[in-house]
UniProtKB/Swiss-Prot annotation:
Catalytic activity from the UniProt record: 5-(2-hydroxyethyl)-4-methylthiazole + ATP = 4-methyl-5-(2-phosphooxyethyl)-thiazole + ADP + H(+)
Entry annotated with the keyword ATP-binding: yes
Provenance organism: Lactococcus lactis subsp. cremoris (strain SK11)
GO MF entries: ATP binding; hydroxyethylthiazole kinase activity; magnesium ion binding
Pathways per UniProt: Cofactor biosynthesis; thiamine diphosphate biosynthesis; 4-methyl-5-(2-phosphoethyl)-thiazole from 5-(2-hydroxyethyl)-4-methylthiazole: step 1/1
InterPro entries for this protein: Hyethyz_kinase, Ribokinase-like
Keywords of the record: ATP-binding, Kinase, Magnesium, Metal-binding, Nucleotide-binding, Thiamine biosynthesis, Transferase
UniProt key word Electron transport: no
Cofactor dependency: Mg(2+)
Binding site for ATP: 114, 159
Enzyme nomenclature, EC number: 2.7.1.50
Gene behind this protein: thiM
The protein's name in its UniProt record: Hydroxyethylthiazole kinase
């Protein structure tokens, strides 16, 4: 059975520590592909929520010193309970966020890390020509993804013109870029949520990361054509395309 088929059959529960810009889009994409989204900002309920969840996705896009204990506890519990732990390290090359991720990484192990070229370069201890959430590097170079995977022990997804999925000694590539992904804030967050959903039902996280990235990218290409390269309706079309794909396998 395909990973998407397993999602339809098991309807996994995905716990998200989302940033406050895109929680609705993240919840929608998880729901539209057949899983159940769950979010919290309360540390007291984390143990019970992680216990019933099938994966934990953390996004540092709006993290603060006051919310750090929530993130640390969610990650710690995910490791303790052997739940896939997925990180979206938004703008990790900014000093405060870098310090947050360094502290988290000293305490927990992330299973999958999804970021753009600048963010993944940070994990590889390399500098990128680009900054923050809008890195635009177009060359296909797996060096940073491979180094990041070796240093972190995580499966790395480096998104860009061509997406690179690496586990340190092997890479797969997804060539499904759309310019509308960059214009619409939150598409990266949505992809990370899809990756978490695929990871929730798969024992092979490398394959799950690749299949999720490919699935999301192909839907983006279809949606781009449907909206004739106009960004305003892109996310709605993307969600509809993802939903239709899940219905076709039922």
């Amino acid at each position: 059975m395909s990973i998407l088929g397993k999602i339809q059959r098991t309807q996994p529960l995905i716990l998200n520590l989302a940033n406050f810009l895109t929680p609705q889009r993240v919840a929608d994409v998880i729901s539209f592909i057949g899983a159940s989204p769950l979010m919290t900002s309360e540390i007291a309920e984390l143990e019970s929520l992680v216990e019933i969840s099938d994966a934990v996705v953390v996004n540092i896009g709006t993290i603060s010193e006051s919310t750090y204990p929530l993130f640390l506890e969610a990650c710690r519990l995910a490791n303790q309970k052997a739940k896939p732990l997925i990180l979206d390290p938004v703008a990790v090359n900014v000093p405060f966020r870098a310090s947050i991720v360094k502290r988290l990484s000293q305490e927990v192990k992330f299973n999958i890390i999804r970021g753009n070229s600048a963010e993944i370069a940070w994990f590889a201890d390399k500098k990128s020509l680009n900054k923050g959430i809008d890195a635009l590097e177009s060359n296909i170079d797996n060096e940073h993804a491979r180094l990041a995977a070796k240093k972190t022990g995580a499966v790395i997804i480096e998104t860009g013109k061509v997406d690179i999925i690496s586990k340190g000694h092997e890479e797969m590539y997804v060539d499904t870029d759309s310019p509308l992904f960059k214009i619409n804030v939150g598409c990266g967050d949505m992809l990370t949520a899809v990756v978490g959903t695929f990871a929730a039902v798969s024992d092979d996280l490398f394959t799950a990361a690749y299949e999720a990235t490919k699935f999301f990218g192909e839907a983006g290409m279809i949606a781009t054509k449907q909206v004739q390269n106009l960004p305003g309706n892109f996310v709605n079309s993307l969600l509809d395309t993802l939903y239709q794909a899940t219905q076709e396998i039922k």
